[in-house]
Amino acid sequence: MQFDVTIEIPKGQRNKYEVDHKTGRVRLDRYLYTPMAYPTDYGFIEDTLGEDGDPLDALVLLPEPLFPGVLVEARPVGMFRMVDEHGGDDKVLCVPVNDHRWDHIHGIIDVPTFELDAIKHFFVHYKDLEPGKFVKAADWVGRDEAEAEVQRSVERFKAGGH
């Protein structure tokens, strides 16, 4: 399975950008309240609709941060299942397709534990200081579950659009 991911937030940022799906422009949503930065490039999978009503979120492992709006052809290796104040907010963990440095990463088991722990720590705590926001459940699942969620999100998009 391969798909395009639109990067919204580069690794290392505290600015939370979002693509305005009506205009196609990148908008500053907020500056994170917690003194933490995004641990990977963050964006969404094109032509999907997640459980939260937004395109399905994606995390892309890259050696250098990209710019908001850049498309990356990616493949899933796992997924971070997360529930926040709006409900399900899963994030598909991906690697770029056309970069042989990632050929050895086939599933979540191949991603270094420290990397997974750092990503989990960020998403469990990044809303801690924001009034009315929270994360109440979060854990990693494998590639098969990630691919199934991508497929469900594609079907939701086709049924309802965005």
Swiss-Prot record:
Substrate binds at residues 16, 30, 42, 126. GO terms for molecular function: inorganic diphosphate phosphatase activity; magnesium ion binding. Mg(2+) 2 binds at residues 8, 57. The keyword Transferase does not apply. It is found in: Cytoplasm. Its cofactor is Mg(2+). Mg(2+) 1 binds at residues 52, 57, 89. Gene3D superfamilies: Inorganic pyrophosphatase. One of its GO terms (biological process) is phosphate-containing compound metabolic process. It catalyses: diphosphate + H2O = 2 phosphate + H(+). SUPFAM superfamilies: Inorganic pyrophosphatase. Homohexamer. Belongs to the PPase family. This is Inorganic pyrophosphatase. The lineage of its organism: Bacteria, Bacillati, Actinomycetota, Actinomycetes, Mycobacteriales.
